Amino acid sequence: IPLRLVGSEMCIRDRNIKISGNECVLENGTQIDVGCDGKGFALDEVKKLLDSEKADCAVVSFGSSTLLYGQKPDKTDFKVAVTDPFDNDNTCLSFTSGGGSVSTSGGYERYFEAQGKKWSHIFDLTTGYPCETDLVSVTVIGQSGIETDFLSTCIFIGGSVELDRWLSDEDIEVIAINENGIVYCSDSIKSRISISDDKFRFE
């Protein structure tokens, strides 16, 4: 977990988990579920393998996390589609990228229903309950798979009220969609986004 991004005090609230510098000690049988950024970590390991083999180009996908590696034979950018969060059988937009890691988080594929309400599989660490957010989809593009995987989840939980800090972050590009179909994005990627459904629109 890239604790430098948020600070360990925001992530660790269990007395059985001790953090000192870069060392983490788990006590009394405590385990950590790496589901939040396991795919991103795996992508980074695949990238190391591709580097060692001097691969020219590859697209590796672990579901919601994808590695765009190298340069395509025709020298054009990669084109990435984002699932429509209101209709999973379709896409809502696409964008082009020269390469890197892409991760998307949302509550539209894995959720449960209780008390007449849909609850996301993504939990808010400050409450211990499924997160309640006005965002329905968050995509992050960057160079590190573990960071894009982790950050897409964090930004999704934080909602649109915390978007500005991420939209202005020069190390990543962000595309976020709220429950009304409004698309927020980093300035650097807006010209490379193509919206494919008229129920979505830029802020």
Please tell me what each predicted stretch does.
Residues 1-7, 11-12:
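Single conserved hydrophobic/aromatic residue that forms the stacking wall/gate
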Residues 14, 55, 75-77, 90-92, ...:
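Extracytoplasmic
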Residues 86, 107-121, 126:
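Pocket-lining segment of extracytoplasmic ligand-binding domains
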